[in-house]
Structure formats: C-alpha cells, structure tokens
A protein has these predicted regions:
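Short, small-residue-biased leader/transition segments that mark boundaries at the very start
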Residues: 3-10
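Active-site-flanking segments in enzyme catalytic domains
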Residues: 19-202
Length: 202
C-alpha cells in the first residue's frame, strides 16, 4: 500500500502556504470558467466552492473541479521552480491555439490531436501540467481508453510528451507518478465511500 512518506519533504517545501477558497465562479474574457490559479508558488485559489455539498458528495465533480485543479496548479509551481525539458514544447508546437482552446469542445476532441484535454491545447506549459493532473486523478483504464481513442497519430504524440513528463517528475523531484496515482485514487475512494467526514473540515 502506497504512502506519502517519500514526498513529505517535497510537499512541505513547495506546497503553497495559502489555499484561498472563493465561493463564486470566476470567468475569463472568452466566457470560460476559471477553476483555479497559482500565484508565485505562494497561493493557490480555488473558485466556485459554494457548489460543494458535504452531505451529497459527487466524487466526479470534486475530481474535475478541485482535485485535478490542485494537481494542475501544484505542477505549475514545480516547473516554475525547476523547468522541464524544452523538447516537450516542440512536440506539438504548431498545434497550440491560445485562448481559443474552448472551441475544441470535449476533451476527446483533443485526444486525436495529441492532447490529454482541450485546455492543454492553450499553450505548452498548460499542456505539461495537464498531463500530470489527468494522469494522477484518473484510473489506468481511463488513461488507456484515452490513448485507444486518440488514434495512431494522437496516441504517439501523447506518449511522446508523457515520457518527458514522467521522467521529469521522477528524475527532478523523485516522484513516481504511478505511485502517486495509487495514493490519490485511494483517497478519492475514501471520500466517495464516506470514510472522510468533510462536514467537520474547518
């Protein structure tokens, strides 16, 4: 059974000292919802937390809007501290579409273009951290299904980029993403099964 012990020093050193909760949603100029922001490694802000109902836990909603966002923003802090191999940026460098990413629609529409989510198509840094966030918050079956439905070219691009991501996390930070995923999914199950009482969290 995996534990967080190997990562204690890392998390204590780099986890933001402030996690800021905003009850209402935030929006970009293009109308897309902002799920979270990271500010200089010191603060992570999560929006729309008034939608969380501790008496009726929807683990899929928590995963999409909060857990995945936390891993996304924390990954930004890591690469801002120690940058990743710039070869990652060149793999799909001509496919990034900036603020028009939302026009891609559902994530599965991005898979065949070599991206794990539509938002990953906005720019290379977002692409990099989306790989981490999606991998550790979803099951192996989800990941394999994504690769299967990405088609030959999309699958090859995702695998090529993820190899750099996986190596970066392991060699730079000593984080094994498979082990971290086991921990994250176990704790998600604890919440979904009522083994964590969210109503007493202050």
């Amino acid at each position: 059974r995996s534990t967080l012990f190997p990562y204690t020093t890392l998390f204590r050193s780099y986890i933001p000292k402030t996690i800021h909760f905003i009850g209402s949603p935030a929006y970009e100029d293009n109308g897309t919802m902002v799920l979270g922001t990271a500010e200089g490694g010191m603060k992570i802000t999560l929006y729309n937390v008034n939608d969380i109902n501790p008496d009726k836990i929807d683990i899929n909603l928590l995963n999409e809007y909060y857990f995945q966002t936390m891993h996304h923003e924390f990954a930004h802090i890591l690469h801002q501290t120690k940058n990743y191999d710039p070869a990652f940026d060149r793999i799909t460098e001509n496919a990034y579409i900036g603020s028009d990413w939302y026009m891609v629609g559902a994530n599965r529409n991005a898979w065949q273009q070599g991206f794990v989510t539509s938002y990953a198509m906005s720019e290379s840094r977002e692409d990099f951290v989306e790989n981490i966030a999606v991998y550790v918050t979803n099951t192996e079956d989800y990941w394999n299904n994504m690769l299967q439905n990405a088609g030959e070219s999309g699958r090859a691009l995702i695998k090529q980029k993820f190899e750099i991501v996986y190596s970066y996390m392991e060699q730079t930070w000593g984080i094994n993403l498979d082990e971290l995923r086991d921990i994250v999914l176990r704790r998600q199950d604890d919440i979904a099964n009522g083994n964590v009482d969210l109503s007493i969290i202050e």
